[in-house]
Amino acid sequence: MRDAIPGAKEDPNYNATGISVVLHPVSPKIPSMHFNTRFIKTTQEWFGGGMDITPCVIFEDEKKYHRGLEVLCNKYDKSYYPKFKKWCDDYFFLKHRNEPRGVGGIFFDYLQTGDWGKDFEFVQGVGTYFHQFIKNTLIALKDEAVSY
């Protein structure tokens, strides 16, 4: 296992911290969401994280969600969104069903550009976007009528 974790082969000591939030709403009109960020430090250090949405019904705000992620990513590096979106799409593809799980999002790992402050700011931005998207988009759906 040490061979699989950058920097752990040289020294098995490490530090890790992270935040993981999973939203499982009562209303089927509000999609399930997952968000996580992490910082790992071995003899090397990097950030990782992401977020994705898995709706129960057609999710009309999918384009708005992806556009917001793209704007966030482009603020730091224009290559982030296409790269991180593909990583998420590949990670959450259900091969046995030949279909994606949900509408995707972004996923990244081993983010270490050499500018720790900028990398940390991006990770904070991911968390802020998750919060803002729930507050500004999903909360409005909580009072919509649902027929069971």
Regions found by a protein language model. Give the residues of each.
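Long, contiguous internal "core" modules enriched in hydrophobic/ aromatic residues
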Residues: E45-S147
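Aromatic- and glycine-enriched beta-alpha-beta binding-site module
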Residues: R2-K63
